[in-house]
Amino acid sequence: MPRSLKKGPFVDDHLQKKVDAENAKGSHNVIKTWSRRSMIVPDMIGHTIAVHDGRKHVPVFVTDSMVGHKLGEFAPTRTYRGHVKEDRKGRRR
């Protein structure tokens, strides 16, 4: 079930403070965060946010089409290496 509209979007306070500070300076430095649960708000457009995926920080450049989604959606936590091919050279009939 989606979040109630009267509550508004959830953004961690420490992340919002970092975004506000970057907007006040007018710079677009990379903002490092562990908050995958924070929702992308219009203040973040144009910033690069490094979202933690469990072992490293994945840089995510925020565009206007991402508003309303969560940061964790853009930093996958699982690496898919494909299915292992079966080795038939050693098999005998």
Curated annotation (Swiss-Prot):
GO terms for molecular function: rRNA binding; structural constituent of ribosome. One of its GO terms (cellular component) is cytoplasm. It holds the Pfam family Ribosomal_S19. Coiled coil: none annotated. Residues 1-23 are annotated as: Disordered. InterPro entries: Ribosomal_uS19, Ribosomal_uS19_bac-type, Ribosomal_uS19_CS, Ribosomal_uS19_SF. PROSITE patterns: RIBOSOMAL_S19. NCBIfam families: rpsS_bact. Belongs to the universal ribosomal protein uS19 family. This is Small ribosomal subunit protein uS19.
